[in-house]
C-alpha cells in the first residue's frame, strides 16, 4: 500500500515512520527545504518534546475530548520508549517537562531524520502540494514537482503559527478542496501586547504572578506562573497559557497581575506595615525591596502614586493603595503578537469530521489528518508535541 504524507513536521514524521514500520510504502512531502524546522524552535531551542502530565485537561478545541483516545493509545511512556529505541536519551524536570539529555532540539530532529533514512522513506523536500484529487478508492496528489498516486493520504501540514519556520495555511485549503471545514483560527502560546508605559521600563524583569484577564467586571480567563516583561507587553509561560483566550476574546480586555498570589489581603497589609518600619528613612519606592525585583517594586509604588516620599511617612491608607497595585497591577491589552510569533494555532480542521480512534476522515475514506492542522491545541510545556506524536502515530497505523 502506498501512503502519501503531506507535511514533514513532528506529526508528519511520526506518521511516516509508523506507516513504514507497519510495512507500507511511504512518500513524505515537505514544502520547506528540510523536515522539522519548527521542531528546532521549540523549548527555546531545547525541544520540550513531551510532558509527564499530558492529559485531555491540557488541550483545547471545540471538542476537547477528541484528543483523549490518541493520548492514551500512544501515551508519554510509549512515546519515550519509541524515541529511546531510536537512540534518544531524555531527562524529566520536576515540572514534568521532558527534554533531550543534550538540551538541544537538534538531537530530537537528528534521531527522526536518521530513522527516516533507515526506513528508506521517499522524502521530497521543497515540494508544494496544490491539490489532492480523488482517484477511485485512492488519490492523486498534485505538486510543483509532479503528481503522485497514493492509496491513502495523511494530512499533517501543520497550522498557521510560526510562519518564519514553516507555518502555513496549506493544510486547511487542501482539506477544504475535499469538503472539510475549519474553525476560526487564533494565535496561541503567544506574547501579549499591552500599554507599554510600565512594561517598557520593566523590560527583562521576571516575576511569579497570578493572572486575571477581564472585560470590565467579567473574568475572561485566569492563570498563574512566571511572567516576563518586554518592551511591548508581557510574555512568559503563564502568559502563553492564557493567550488563547485573549486571542479569541476581542477588544476591551485588561490583564491584572497579582505579585503576591499566595497571600490574602490581611497578610499583605501586615507585611506592608512591617516594610514601612524597616524602610524608615528611605524613599517609598524601596518599600518592596527584598520581595520583588527592585525595578518592579519601584514601578508598583509609582503606579500607586509614591516614589520620593519617605517610606515612614506613608499612612495606612497609602499602604492600601500600594497593596491594590501589588494584588491587581492592571494593564490594558492591545492585542497579541500574531501568528508570526505564536508557537501554535488555536483552531483548525473540525474534529467532528474525523474519527478520534483512527484519525480518518468521516467525509473522505482513506484520508487522515494529525497534529496542528486539526482543531486541537495544548498548553505550554510539551503538550503540543505530545499531541503531534500521539495523533501522528495513530494516523500512521492507517486503521479503518
Where are these regions (language model features)?
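Beta1/beta-strand and adjacent pyrophosphate-binding region of the FAD-binding site
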Residues: 1-11
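Glycine-rich FAD pyrophosphate-binding loop
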Residues: 4, 20-44
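A conserved short coil-to-beta-strand element within the FAD-binding core of flavoproteins
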Residues: 125-138
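Short hydrophobic core segments
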Residues: 4-6, 29, 129, 148-164, ...
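Glycine-rich active-site loop/strand segments that organize a redox cofactor
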Residues: 44-92
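Glycine-rich loop(s) and the adjacent beta-strand/alpha-helix scaffold that form part
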Residues: 152-198
Amino acid at each position: 500500500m502506498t501512503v502519501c504524507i503531506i507535511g514533514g513536521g513532528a506529526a508528519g514524521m511520526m506518521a511516516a515512520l509508523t506507516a513504514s514500520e507497519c510495512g507500507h510504502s511511504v512518500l513524505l512531502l515537505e514544502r520547506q527545504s528540510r523536515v522539522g524546522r519548527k521542531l528546532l524552535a521549540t523549548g527555546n531551542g531545547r525541544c520540550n518534546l513531551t510532558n509527564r502530565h499530558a492529559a485531555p485537561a491540557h488541550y483545547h478545541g471545540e471538542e476537547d475530548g477528541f484528543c483523549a483516545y490518541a493520548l492514551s493509545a500512544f501515551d508519554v511512556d510509549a512515546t519515550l520508549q519509541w524515541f529511546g529505541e531510536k537512540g534518544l536519551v531524555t531527562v524529566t524536570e520536576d515540572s514534568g517537562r521532558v527534554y533531550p539529555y543534550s538540551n538541544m532540539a537538534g538531537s530530537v530532529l537528528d534521531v527522526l531524520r536518521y530513522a527516516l533514512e533507515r526506513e528508506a522513506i521517499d522524502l521530497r523536500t521543497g515540494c508544494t502540494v496544490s491539490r489532492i484529487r480523488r482517484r477511485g478508492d485512492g488519490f492523486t496528489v498534485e505538486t510543483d514537482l509532479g503528481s503522485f498516486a497514493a492509496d491513502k493520504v495523511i494530512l499533517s501540514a501543520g497550522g498557521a503559527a510560526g510562519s518564519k519556520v514553516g507555518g502555513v495555511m496549506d493544510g486547511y485549503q487542501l482539506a477544504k478542496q475535499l469538503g472539510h471545514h475549519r474553525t476560526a483560527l487564533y494565535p496561541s502560546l503567544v506574547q501579549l501586547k499591552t500599554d507599554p508605559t510600565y512594561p517598557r521600563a520593566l523590560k527583562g524583569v521576571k516575576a511569579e504572578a497570578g493572572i486575571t484577564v477581564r472585560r470590565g467586571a467579567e473574568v475572561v480567563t485566569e492563570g498563574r506562573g512566571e511572567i516576563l516583561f518586554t518592551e511591548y507587553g508581557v510574555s512568559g509561560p503563564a502568559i502563553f497559557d492564557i493567550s488563547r483566550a485573549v486571542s479569541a476574546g476581542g477588544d476591551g480586555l485588561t490583564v491584572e497581575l497579582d505579585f503576591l498570589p499566595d497571600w490574602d489581603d490581611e497578610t499583605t497589609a501586615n507585611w506592608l506595615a512591617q516594610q514601612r518600619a524597616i524602610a524608615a528613612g528611605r524613599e517609598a519606592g524601596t518599600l518592596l525591596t527584598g520581595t520583588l525585583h527592585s525595578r518592579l517594586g519601584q514601578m508598583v509604588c509609582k503606579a500607586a502614586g509614591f516614589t520620593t516620599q519617605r517610606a515612614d511617612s506613608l499612612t495606612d491608607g497609602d499602604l492600601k493603595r500600594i497593596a491594590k497595585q501589588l494584588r491587581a497591577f492592571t494593564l490594558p491589552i492591545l492585542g497579541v503578537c500574531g501568528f508570526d510569533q505564536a508557537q501554535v494555532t488555536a483552531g483548525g480542521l473540525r474534529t467532528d469530521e474525523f474519527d478520534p480512534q483512527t484519525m480518518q476522515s468521516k467525509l473522505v475514506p482513506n484520508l487522515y489528518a494529525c497534529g496542528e492542522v486539526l482543531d486541537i491545541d495544548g498548553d505550554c510545556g510539551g503538550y503540543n508535541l505530545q499531541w503531534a506524536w500521539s495523533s501522528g502515530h495513530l494516523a500512521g497505523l492507517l486503521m479503518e
